[in-house]
């Protein structure tokens, strides 16, 4: 990525812990998508070396003829490219190599963001399973209590039935939470290539938002990759134009015919009649127009992605701060008040169940809010092109 972004945002607040960086670095080393991108880059580098060379090698020819006089000749011929041709091909290949180098950075950042987001979803899933288990136990205990109170005639049949339904719903929600966790662990295992382990957890301390005004969108890897693709397409026009110029073939031969020495020089030049190369030039120009449009799309997409992820993270972080400031304590206090009101007979069984469900729903929403905020943070780092700097993974 560009040095401007690295200089401005290389150390955003909330630097990743070393343990998390070590896990991600291990995943990156073994990731097949990154390995494939690295292989494509190596292939492009090799092609760039070959693109600057002449396409044709010298040819050696031996001719022998026996008639009244024996004739033998040895010759060497070479198709000579105009010197601008290899240079034009080399420049176009260099641009494609630069594009793939930026695409490799882009792939790495996408993989790292996906891995970090996967960690968050697994951590969130485990927290939701723990909460669902607590809900199941609470509802089960209350259903047992309601059944006893019903037998003693203290509550109505409908109230006891409501408690049993709530307990059943809690069991179902716990099963759903277990399934969601299993799916999250499966997706993460597919991404990391290892079976579920003690993945890292994420606390409620969210980093401060990035100042996206410091981000130079033109230096983001996705934009740079598109820019070099356009540059390569522009240079391919020159390649196609030079390919229209015929390459002469020059040859020399030496031999003998009977007792006489033979020496000859030959020069041949193709006549571009059947294929003038105009269609290749037209195609190259069309490809250049397409690459220019792709660059504009990449610029627009990167700018929108950066702006919207920043807005989304700021909104989620503000909600998280508000929850920690007032909502979390309010839920704990309300749970105690609710239990005292039930014990004192101030509320009935059904009202107690409704309010208790609301408290559990609020806690579940807070878990989801925290997970969404962390995912948005990692997406913001990716959008700003600094997720590798934040996590501390070396390229």
Question: Whereabouts are the PLM-identified features?
Answer:
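Bacterial Sec-pathway N-terminal export signals of envelope proteins
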Residues: 1-59, 63, 79-80, 87-88, ...
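Periplasmic alpha-helical coiled-coil/stalk elements that build and connect Gram-negative outer-membrane
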Residues: 3, 107-219, 309-316, 320, ...
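A small-residue-enriched
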Residues: 22-82, 217-282, 286-289, 293-294, ...
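Generic hydrophobic alpha-helical segments
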Residues: 24, 146, 213, 337-339
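Heptad-repeat amphipathic alpha-helical coiled-coil interaction surface used
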Residues: 36, 41-43, 48-50, 90-92, ...
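Short segments within alpha-helical structural elements
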Residues: 107-109, 169-194, 330-386
